[in-house]
Amino acid sequence: MKLLHVDGSILGPHSVSRTVSAAIVDRLRAQHPDLDVAYRDLAQTPLPHLSGAVLAGAQPNATNAPDVQHDVDLGRQALDEFLAADVVVIGAPLYNFTLSSQLKAWIDRILVAGVTFRYGPSGAEGLAGGKRVIAVVSRGGLYGPGTPAAAAEHAETYLRTVLAFIGITAPEIIVAEGIALGPEARERALAGALDAAAALKAA
């Protein structure tokens, strides 16, 4: 079984989403000793944001300048990693009400018409169903249902929308929120998220 582990936090060892996503991978590795894990650290090795040149350069039979071809190849590598994975674990912090730009750049490389989705007579159809996706969403404040800031949460909601669009309709999402509200709140949020990670079922 192949697992793709993607981290979008820029906070390194201080990151809650990284801590919990690593715990998830450890949990699944313990259940599946032969697990083949690919790791993509989007802070250490960010993908370039999409450009018009790259979109054109990704078309069949395109002739590209070396720098454009390098960018196209990076996107294809990210897409191939995603397509090959049976399980995808994503560390997704909430920055300024949405995902980190590094994680968004990765998403832009895996949402590819004709590969992970297509348009038909009835609209969009996801082509990447069948994968298990587990995401950790960390939030400094309180954005859960019923909170005053719930409508401003565009990390978990965006992830659910994007994943459903490509056919992954039942992602497992672990939320750690309130981590910026003081040391005790952070510890409670982290402990709860780690408990949820430890309780994940085998794939």
UniProtKB/Swiss-Prot annotation:
Reactions catalysed according to its record: 2 a quinone + NADH + H(+) = 2 a 1,4-benzosemiquinone + NAD(+); N,N-dimethyl-1,4-phenylenediamine + anthranilate + 2 NAD(+) = 2-(4-dimethylaminophenyl)diazenylbenzoate + 2 NADH + 2 H(+)
Gene3D superfamilies in the cross-refs: 3.40.50.360
Top-level taxon in the UniProt lineage: Bacteria
Cofactor(s) required for function per UniProt: FMN
GO MF term set: electron transfer activity; FMN binding; oxidoreductase activity, acting on NAD(P)H as acceptor; oxidoreductase activity, acting on NAD(P)H, quinone or similar compound as acceptor
Residues reported in the UniProt entry to bind FMN: S9, S15, V16, S17, S138, R139, G140, G141
Cofactor note: Binds 1 FMN per subunit.
Keyword terms of this UniProt record: Flavoprotein, FMN, NAD, Oxidoreductase
EC number, UniProt record: 1.6.5.-, 1.7.1.17
Function per UniProt: Quinone reductase that provides resistance to thiol-specific stress caused by electrophilic quinones. Also exhibits azoreductase activity. Catalyzes the reductive cleavage of the azo bond in aromatic azo compounds to the corresponding amines.
Homology family: Belongs to the azoreductase type 1 family.
Subunit (UniProt): Homodimer.
Protein name per UniProt: FMN-dependent NADH:quinone oxidoreductase
Organism: Methylorubrum populi (strain ATCC BAA-705 / NCIMB 13946 / BJ001)
